């Protein structure tokens, strides 16, 4: 399982593409809770399929793609390397995003953060309620599939909300360091909430692991 309080994400999926020559295969991280632990907000069937099928598929496909990329590197086949970039982005992003997502959730979650994270939220968004409204709106507004994110802009030292399509990883595509991700692919909620994404988003706030989000925030400030 990925460390809960790590500032970056690419370092968590070691080795990076630059070290494919001696790479180790990625593996599906264990959940830090049972599949049914987030009920009634997210049911066990969704969690089991989401983790053991969808996330597992990203991991498997990432490993296959990296093997092909390694072969292309060895052959000096730049065309093949370029052709593999979309699969690396999609499956690598899926693995990064979900590895963060599982730790962002907890059966003991919900409520509000405390301490420096809460103060930063108030500073950058006006209040915790306004922050929730903005992140919810960004997540609802994702067209098709994607993610809503709370990220940290290290250059400016501020929190920032962003939405990413498909499995685009936040840090790799925007430079923001991910603190809290909300998966709005239909496989994350459809079996329970059908096509009513706002109901799912209302429910997920009850299981947000603010301790984990705070650890990520504090790590990024160092």
Curated annotation (Swiss-Prot):
The keyword Oxidoreductase applies. InterPro entries: Fe/Mn_Superoxide_Dismutase (IPR050265), Mn/Fe_SOD (IPR001189), Mn/Fe_SOD_BS (IPR019833), Mn/Fe_SOD_C (IPR019832), Mn/Fe_SOD_N (IPR019831), Mn/Fe_SOD_N_sf (IPR036324), SOD_C_sf (IPR036314). Its cofactor is Mn(2+). Gene3D superfamilies: Fe,Mn superoxide dismutase (SOD) domain, Iron/manganese superoxide dismutase, C-terminal domain. Pfam families: Sod_Fe_C, Sod_Fe_N. It catalyses: 2 superoxide + 2 H(+) = H2O2 + O2. One of its GO terms (cellular component) is mitochondrial matrix. The modification N6-acetyllysine is found at residues 68, 75, 114, 122, 130, 202. This is Superoxide dismutase [Mn], mitochondrial. It comes from Pongo pygmaeus (Bornean orangutan).
